[in-house]
Amino acid sequence: MEECEEPEEPISLGRQEYRRRRRPSQPMVDKSQQTEITEKRKAMASVQPPAPKATHSIGNIPGSKDNYSRKEYESLRLSSQLQKTLMKRKHVQDMTDKSLQTEPIVEEKVEVIFIDKTLKLEENTAGVGEIAPELPQSIPEVEIPTSRPTSHLIDRSQQTSCTGDWSLIYICPKEKVDKEQQTYFSELEIIIRSIPGSSMTKSKEETIPIAQEDPLVEINGSLEIEVLSPEELPDVMMSFTEGEISGELQALSNGEATVKGELFLTEEIPIQAPSPAEETSAAETATTTAKDVVDIQAPPADKLSSVEAPADISPTLVQGALSDKPSDQQYPQGTEMAPSELPVEDLDPFSEEVLEKVQALTTDSMLEDLGIAESTIAEETSGKVQHPLSEETSKEVPAEVHFPIAADFEESAILINEKFATDEVFEEYKPPIIEEVSADKATAEVQPPSAEDASEEVASSEVLPPSTEQGTVEDLTAEVLSTPTEEGPTEVPPQPTEEGPAEVPPPLSEEGPAEVPPAPAEEAPAEVLPPPAEEAPAEVPPPLTEEGPAEVPPPLTEEGPAEVPLAPAEEVPAEFLPPPAEEVPAEVPPPLTEEGPAEVPPPLTEEGPEEVPPLPAEEAPTKVPPSPAEKGSAEVSPPQTEEGPAEVPPPPAEEFPTEVPSSSAEEGSSEVPLPPTAERPEEAPPPATEEAPVEVLPPATEEAPVEVLPPATEEAPVEVQSPAAEEGLAEVPPPPTEESPTHDVPTEVQVPQAKESPGQVLPLSGESTAEEASAQVQPPSFEKAPLESLPLEEVEKIHLDNLPFEVQPLPTEDIAIGVPAESQALPADENPAREDTVETQPSSFEGAPIAENPIEAPLPASEADTGREDSAVHPSSLGPTDEAPAEIQILQTDDIPTEMSPVENQPLPAEEGFPEVVSEEEATAAEVRFPLSEGAPAQEATVEAQLTSVEESPKRASVDVQPLSPETPVEESPGVDLPLKTNEVTMQEFRVEKMPAEDSLPPSEQTPADQVLLKEHRLSQVADISEKELESTTLTSDKMSEGIDSVPEDVSGTKDDQISTFKIEGTIKIELKN
């Protein structure tokens, strides 16, 4: 056989192998039966016999690609039958052998192939020779195979199937192996092959390079993104920006477009679409656009300028506030290097800012279009509102950037328009101040209605600016970006869009038309506010949205307003807040609108008008107090009186009715639309909370008051306050009014939570008849909210958890802002509890401190930090709220725990931790406890938010938390008493908290994002707490990356960083930061 083999490998070998294989073929038949065994035998035998003879065979197999090829060619020379038979069986056996010998052969082949290829590359026959003696033959053939393989490869690629049978079997197996290995090694082989430049290699190489290049290019984009991502922000930007912005922008598009107007959508989406892909481009574009928008807006000057400057500035402002220069730089850079620079330069700040900015810019671009379009739309939407709307929208554009700012813009736009130079300065970053000042002034002047909205918004915006930044950034980053910033609605809409968008748009539409300014304002405010104030709420709404995206938008919108007030309240807002609070009412109407679009208008109209008047009454917020007042009429009354509740009551009554109707109706409607409520939970919780929820809750809870509460809720604070009002409602209301909005949202959120435990809430309510009423109502609300809220809230929670960071960031923001609402918003998920808590806390936090002056004193920091009259006001509310919040919180805790089992669990931790935390609280515990307390109730997010909330809460929540222990009972039983206890405890706790108060503040701000940001931003202050909290928050933060977004205005800048982080990076970023 060997002779035959030697004489003619092809013929002899063919025959002999044929024979041999025939022999094995019988075993092969058997083999088919005895597959393994026979194969092995055959393989062994075949391999072995072929080893000598098959050396050629094997040689053929490994190196014999050549030999075999030649052989086959020669075989081809042989009779076709022999060849066929041979090939068939040979292939079979070879395949079998190969399969058996695959590894060795493959290895050999691989070696050969690699070497072959290498040889091919190098053309080293020696290498081949080294591979096998056979290869010497194959050596020439190696070269030949080089050609043939090339041909074969080519053929193979072409003839994969046909020729591939044997050619492939050998070649393929070899080459396939090679290829696979090359495929795996494709890099090496590609490289190697690239070296050889074989057609295959080239093709492959080219193909791969092309593919890779594209991917690489894409990847480069991605990589850049990723690379940027290494920068965190870039990644976040890219991911966030791309996904987020895309999502957000798109979300914005959906939500915003929906909300803002298809213009927005169209404009925005384009940008959006670009933004994701282009995010950088979009960022640039957005940035450029933003700049252009600035320019363009500048042309709109009034709006765009105002807006844009604000937008730009807002971002700048916000960012400027946070990262003034970075904003600017980022802005420019954003323009140029949006992706890289954005991420790179400030990456975090920048990125976020940029993101925010980009989004802002993008938003601006969109807004630009939107602003124009929206202005148009806004204008169209509401002729009169339109301007504000437009401005607002324009602002909203900025608002989108920082809708909060948008709010400012609305106001600022107006103000800015008034103070356009300032606006320009705004651009300079003074704008922030100016904006704020303007916001303040504007708030004062705008405050009337616009002022109210604007103020609120401005305040919000203003607050938001930071908030926005946070909100925006947060929004941007968080989604809030989209949601809050983009428009809490828009984004939220996106999320809300999911629900919100429609709703948001409704708010927008409803609001837009009626409230359009509010809508925009609200949107901007809401959105803006939401972003900031609501941001947590709104954001929360987003979380809520998550929970009830749609809701979120409403929340944003609604809450935004309310929340915005919160935010504003929170920020400058405190002062503005009152207007905002009131405004929130007005704005709330939007929320109402949101909640009850139709209603909203009424509410808006009534409320808005009324509210606006209330605005003056501003503390029409009192109105909220009214709610509280209503809620806790007598009780609240004092607060109302404080707030002007009397007035408010009427307005509340009216508003209440109106608002309540609106809110209530809205809430009832919308709320009733628990679906909306569901949304509402979000919305309600946020908006509702802010308004409906709270309102509902408060109203419902309080009085059915639901309606009234709505107003109250509107001043959910009231509601929350309700409890507080109930407890110290009167007191709370005023603060509530101011804080109310803030609280409001929280309350609302709370509502959800309360909602969660209507009973509990009731117990809370029980605690105070009013409260009980509230609770009652709340239960309705809660029920409503609970139903939805619970689900939503839960969803929210989930979403929050998912979005948590966003939400949380909001909270942070808010919290930071002092709008615990935000935290609440964040909590929103937990929000309800948190919100309530937070808000209440904010109230508590602010108010509580005030309420519990001791804490307030500490809180003052928070409060100061929060910079909330709210604090002051809230303190009253807070005091009550504190108590109520405690209740609520407890409720929340209960509810939240219920709603958020996590929270619940957490609450326990909070409770447990709470004391524990309390120790820390002394150190940082307030915060920690805060988180724990509230967090426990709320959730981790809550924790985080709670950190914030709790922080605030600690003031009241702390007490609450302490009640937490009671809270556990509370949890067990709403423990109406507990709330009371809490109240009492609150005093105590507050004292303890008091120390934390400061921490609190940071914690509030510190809210996850805040923490991080705070950490950075306030790091000094918060450093310890931030750190601690951050850690705890980090989880929460990560969970609630939103928290990052939430980063208070202060934190804003940082938050921006966080923001980028916040969403995706939020966690990552946080991690990174952490």
From Swiss-Prot:
Gene Ontology molecular functions: calcium ion binding
Post-translational modification note: Phosphorylated by PKA upon spermatozoa capacitation conditions.
GO biological process: negative regulation of protein sumoylation
Positions with biased composition (Low complexity): 274-290, 448-467, 558-575, 689-720
Bias type Pro residues, positions: 528-544, 576-592, 673-688
Region (Disordered): 1-73, 272-294, 317-343, 437-789, 818-982, 1026-1054
Cross-referenced InterPro entries: FSCB (IPR043375)
Predominant location category: other
Annotated localization: Cell projection, Cilium, Flagellum
GO cellular component, one term: sperm fibrous sheath
Residues found modified as Phosphoserine: 25, 57, 186, 275, 365, 1020
Tissue localization of expression: Expression is restricted to testis and epididymis, expressed by spermatozoa.
Alphabetized UniProt keyword annotations: Calcium, Cell projection, Cilium, Flagellum, Phosphoprotein
Assembly and binders: Interacts with CABYR. Interacts with ROPN1 and ROPN1L; the interaction increases upon spermatozoa capacitation conditions.
Function, as annotated: May be involved in the later stages of fibrous sheath biogenesis and spermatozoa capacitation. Inhibits ROPN1 and ROPN1L SUMOylation. Binds calcium.
Entry protein name: Fibrous sheath CABYR-binding protein
Organism of derivation: Mus musculus
UniProt gene name: Fscb
